[in-house]
């Protein structure tokens, strides 16, 4: 198993009377993923950081990865999964969105944190609720302009974060913690059920009005300011003053470096279109690729030190809370026959899910047509955002993608990391956001992309 030194900087978050009221402890441990965390008072140059320059591109994945392709019958069918890392890119610590619909903000900011690690060797933690506040005001404005037909909800896409970065900048979490209430450690995590109901009620009250006042946005902003805190116009970070825009500039991030990719047949390949899902309300123009080429982009990115923001559907039976995402061939009834098959047919869906995900089993072979059918009949929805950062293999040599979730480090059997099979990635990927330089050259040419 690959041995990788990981630096955890565990912050004890105090009552936010100061932007920098935190302490740090440094712990060196061994893990499958390179996880690096830092408080705003301390700059850490990680001992292991991917090269700033991409490696030589190849049109196919690494030879090691190619050998692991395919879906052979599992040789080791003992209970559980055992994973060995093949390749991984440095990431920051797993965060917890808790009871909020803000996975899109957490996952894409994690992606940008890895970008800063890649280019600067610097650890930073962005403020998700700054992005949420800015985005929800924009979404409310859109809903009102569309006469409230679109659903006003807390969901969003990776592009919302990139749009925010370009137009409003970003801030470190210490400048806007995003929690203004709570009496215990558990209460210091986002709980947005009340906020969502209040803001939906506010927007809903506008419906049917003959004329809107010019201050309705100010009223809505006051609600978000009350629950999340005001978005800072200026702040201090590591002894220097910044605006949200100058902070982004200091980190070398450029919104124009990032593009969204998808793979569906109801629009021409190698052209752009706005994927028709509710959370793409900004109508982000995504580049459309055949699924095989989209998978090549993912593999090439990881091989060259890039991560990806991943928009996916996790409602499938093979996506578990234990940290696994697979597409088991349920039609085979877990390879049962006779009386065992009869028992299988009589199982509840929860029990079937347990049986199909407790050990490596054969998976469905996913085609472009299967992807499209699942999208067209609403089996594939845009319900979750995560960060792809590595590859691994199980005890039988089958290949998986390592994905950072935002459900806290106590979720899953792998400290907040999920292992997603190639079949699941092919089937349930809605879109990915990636740096243009991470795309293989031949695909960039087809998309007519220029890079710096």
Task: Describe these PLM feature segments.
Residues 34, 63, 373-376:
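Transition segments tied to proteolytic processing and entry into folded domains
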Residues 83-252, 259-268, 273-280, 285-308, ...:
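Active-site nucleophile-adjacent alpha helix/oxyanion-hole segment immediately C-terminal to the catalytic cysteine
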Residues 218-452:
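Active-site signature of cysteine proteases
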Residues 26-50, 69-89, 93:
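N-terminal regions that are enriched for targeting/export leaders
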Residues 1-24, 63-66:
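Bacterial Sec-dependent N-terminal signal peptides
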Residues 23-27, 389:
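Terminal-region recognition feature
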């Amino acid at each position: 198993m690959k041995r990788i030194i990981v630096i955890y900087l565990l912050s004890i978050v105090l009552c936010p009377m100061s932007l920098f009221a935190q302490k740090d402890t440094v712990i060196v441990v061994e893990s499958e993923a390179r996880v690096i965390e830092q408080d705003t008072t301390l700059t850490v140059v990680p001992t292991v950081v991917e090269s700033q320059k991409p490696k030589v591109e190849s049109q196919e994945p690494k030879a090691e990865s190619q050998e692991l392709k395919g879906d052979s019958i599992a040789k080791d069918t003992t209970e559980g999964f055992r994973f060995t890392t093949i390749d991984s890119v440095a990431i920051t610590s797993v965060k917890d969105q808790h009871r909020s619909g803000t996975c899109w903000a957490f996952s894409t900011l994690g992606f940008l944190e890895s970008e800063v690690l890649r280019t600067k060797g610097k650890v930073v933690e962005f403020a998700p609720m700054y992005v949420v506040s800015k985005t929800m005001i924009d979404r409310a404005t859109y809903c009102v302009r569309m006469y409230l037909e679109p659903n006003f909800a807390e969901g969003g896409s990776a592009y919302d974060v990139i749009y925010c970065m370009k137009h409003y900048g970003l801030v470190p979490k210490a400048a806007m913690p995003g929690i203004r209430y709570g009496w215990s450690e558990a209460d210091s995590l986002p709980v947005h059920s009340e906020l969502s109901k209040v803001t939906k009620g506010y927007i809903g009250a506008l419906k049917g009005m003959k004329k809107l006042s010019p201050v309705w946005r100010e009223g809505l902003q006051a609600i978000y300011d009350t629950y999340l805190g005001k978005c800072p116009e200026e702040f201090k970070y590591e002894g220097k003053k910044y605006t949200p825009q100058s902070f982004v500039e200091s980190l070398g991030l450029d919104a124009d470096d990032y593009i969204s990719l998808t793979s569906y047949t109801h629009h021409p390949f190698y052209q752009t279109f706005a994927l028709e899902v509710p959370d793409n309300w900004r109508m982000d123009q995504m580049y459309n690729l055949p699924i095989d080429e989209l998978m090549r982009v993912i593999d090439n990115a990881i091989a060259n030190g890039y991560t990806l923001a991943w928009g996916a559907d996790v409602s499938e039976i093979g996506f578990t809370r234990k940290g696994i995402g697979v597409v088991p061939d349920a039609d085979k009834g877990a390879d049962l026959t006779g009386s065992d098959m009869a028992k299988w047919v009589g199982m509840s869906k929860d029990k079937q899910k347990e049986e199909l995900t407790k050990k490596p089993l054969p998976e469905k072979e996913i085609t472009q047509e299967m992807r499209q059918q699942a999208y067209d009949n609403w089996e594939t929805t845009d319900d979750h955002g995560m960060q792809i950062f590595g590859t691994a293999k199980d005890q039988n040599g089958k290949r998986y993608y390592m994905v950072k979730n935002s459900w806290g480090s106590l979720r899953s059997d792998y400290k907040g990391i999920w292992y997603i099979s190639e079949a699941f990635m092919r089937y349930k990927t809605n879109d990915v956001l990636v740096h243009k330089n991470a795309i293989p050259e031949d695909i960039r040419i087809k998309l007519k992309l220029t890079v710096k």
